[in-house]
């Protein structure tokens, strides 16, 4: 069958059809996006400009913050502008690029969270060999692996979609281009493509979740052998990570580990993992982590002192 593609652009339905609600959402999500940028940039700068960057855990945390900024920036700016726009359109090429970006940075974040769980496992269960196992070369290779894995996943998703014919309609009941809403617009049978898309996303999400579950199960068992202070410190750092895993994996599992169907709740769930989660990341890691808070106080307190002294 020859591919027929009469669609040159798509039209988003957006978050709401009510102008009043859209104005409120514009203010709220503009504020959220600013928090995402400032909060994650603060973590990146604090880690990179302090001794924390030498620690594998904070090395990965800085890149997690970077990915969070990129991940939310794929969808948030366009969504915010569209909230006040009469025509919420995106070109066909722009749609495919957005689909790629969402899955690339989303999958990369999953892999980084998995690597961070392994890092905590080595730190708590094999403390004497920690710096030998998690040396900088190993960390760089792991980080590279997360980016390569994210790229392979997203390129497969996009390749499955671009080979489909789109001849109309071109209205997407969403605020960004994602696989399931776009598949509904293809003018051909998409059952097999939907199964492959779900298998691709499901394998990554389920496989990563199993690794996370095993890592933290072993960690919790090993904590019984440690002192009260050791348990408190370990639970503090692991607690932050577990919180991020739960609030990110929960919505992603609902969206991608299911058949090729769409639900009315999809847009609200998508808001949670594309905007709310990246916004909560800095809060969770700073409020529950004494080392990050102390590094921020020392670094930014010193800078303020130097500026005052210079004047």
From Swiss-Prot:
Extracellular compartment spans: 1-23, 78-98, 157-193, 257-267
Gene3D superfamilies assigned to the protein according to its UniProt record, in alphabetical order: Rhodopsin 7-helix transmembrane proteins
Record-annotated membrane-spanning stretches: 24-47, 56-77, 99-118, 138-156, 194-217, 234-256, 268-287
PROSITE patterns the record matches: G_PROTEIN_RECEP_F1_1 (PS00237), G_PROTEIN_RECEP_F1_2 (PS50262)
Annotated localization: Cell membrane
Protein role: Odorant receptor.
PANTHER family: OLFACTORY RECEPTOR (PTHR48002)
Residues bearing attached sugar chains per UniProt: 6
Keywords: Cell membrane, Disulfide bond, G-protein coupled receptor, Glycoprotein, Membrane, Olfaction, Receptor, Sensory transduction, Transducer, Transmembrane, Transmembrane helix
Membrane topology per record: Multi-pass membrane protein
Top-level taxonomic group: Eukaryota
Name of this protein: Olfactory receptor 4S2
Record-stated family: Belongs to the G-protein coupled receptor 1 family.
Cytoplasmic topological intervals: 48-55, 119-137, 218-233, 288-311
Paired cysteines (S-S): 95-187
GO cellular component: plasma membrane
GO function terms (MF aspect): G protein-coupled receptor activity; olfactory receptor activity
